[in-house]
């Protein structure tokens, strides 16, 4: 809507105005911005500048208890001094025990620490389960498998805090969904993937004309379904590298035919984490980055161009069955399995992480219980006295 362009700096994705941005809201009287807690300072400033000349009303809708934009301590939308504010009190996404848990985590009524193992907390509107780790994993596998069989991936997801935990859980989730085939192929037809970064034109086998933007074929955080997979040997010399830059490997990866709604793309994928091909690719990227830095601002420009072309030549997609809490914000799922690293996050964002993770669930929340102090256990039993006693 704002006619922005994507600028990629290191591993960050930034929005910048274009020549069309200033007039983007010219004919609009009202613009509604949902999930406003994720609007960063730069995007907020651009939106306000665009709206001012045309007196366009901007209505921001969001929850200040959710996570702020990456790299910011708080959501700038809620710090605006001249805004007219209103609070909505009725929760409609979830009810019952899920709502109770989300509310207690949000207002501090329950500590954001690993819960105790408890009997099922449930009523006719939903449930919360606190189980030993093995039982949690078994139920997660069953739920993911059932969601796949029903062709409803939003029926169950695993949420975690760190990418390290995500990479550890992804193989477990893929085996649950795809069985033995998961260990034979890094990507399978029918698999639901999510873009972990914007996919740029060099990664598209169809060229940039099929994408969502001139240089970007698929935005970040977009889910796609894999239709077909083809092995591909990618010679990095095709991207301007030469033996003068060091060893130039051939990267064994795959091209995936994917669809997202009416959009169909053929993308060259990054090799999976931990594979020989991924280590070789990462090694070349690290070497180019260091060479560019050593060459200085003027002499390093050509090296940086090769670096960015190579980086953009591989799409960063991963299985959508396991998501980080940050990536899940704005979505909702039936059953949510919360990994324990969410409760071990830095204290400054732990409450927001726990609240966002739990509030993604429409029906059920599954937590790993155990090791809680008597004080923590009493807090949980008191908070859910009615639904525990009805179990």
Language model features with spans:
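C-terminal accessory regions
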Residues: 235-391
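Loop/turn-to-beta-strand initiation segments
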Residues: 27-30, 54-60, 364-366
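Conserved helicase motor core of P-loop NTPases
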Residues: 56, 65-280
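Walker B catalytic acidic pair
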Residues: 34-35, 62-64
